[in-house]
A protein has these predicted regions:
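Extracellular/periplasmic catalytic domains that process cell-envelope and extracellular macromolecules
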Residues: 57-59, 72-74, 86-88
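A ubiquitous, low-specificity "background" feature that marks scattered single residues
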Residues: 31, 46, 73, 113-115
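Beta-strand-rich interaction/scaffold domains
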Residues: 86-134
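Generic detector of low-complexity/intrinsically disordered segments
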Residues: 5, 25, 52, 82, ...
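A short beta-strand element within beta-rich, extracytoplasmic domains
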Residues: 66, 74-86
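Flexible, small-residue-rich N-terminal segments that precede or flank a structured functional core
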Residues: 1-68, 100
Length: 134
């Protein structure tokens, strides 16, 4: 099996809001970064208490761009290796996206989905396979 590494347009987009429901429905990030530098946050959903006691919710979404143009046959299998840790249980999903030539704040909601999953169970093994457009 050929090994394909992600490219130089990898990065993240982050959004924050005082309201969790509003944040989940956000379509544009407040900041984005595409660089060959290092970021220790691949995905994150968190609730933070700010100085003064106000609450802010934050979502980081990471983007990894793979050049698959050299693949000439239809793949029968693929493996994506991701390492990480969680402070508690939670689901994360790998979803196709249509990010721009340069990753930007507008790519935050560039996911290729059909419909929305009804719920996530927090086990870390959830599936949204039926909602992913391939």
């Amino acid at each position: 099996m050929a090994i394909i590494y992600s490219g130089t347009n990898d990065g993240y987009a982050v959004a924050a809001n005082a309201n969790w429901v509003t944040l989940k429905n956000t379509t544009t990030a407040s900041a984005a970064s595409a660089s060959t530098g290092f970021s220790n946050t691949a995905i994150q959903g968190s609730k933070r208490t700010l100085r003064g006691g106000s609450i802010v919710y934050v979502i980081f979404r990471s983007f990894f761009e793979f050049d698959t143009s050299a693949i000439t046959a239809t793949p029968t299998a693929a493996t994506l290796n991701i390492s990480g840790r969680s402070n508690n249980s939670g689901d994360f999903f790998v979803i196709a996206s249509n990010q721009g030539a340069t990753l930007g704040t507008g790519d935050y909601d560039a996911m290729v989905l059909t419909g929305t999953p009804a719920s996530y169970d927090g086990s870390g093994t959830g599936s949204i396979e039926s909602h992913v457009t391939k």
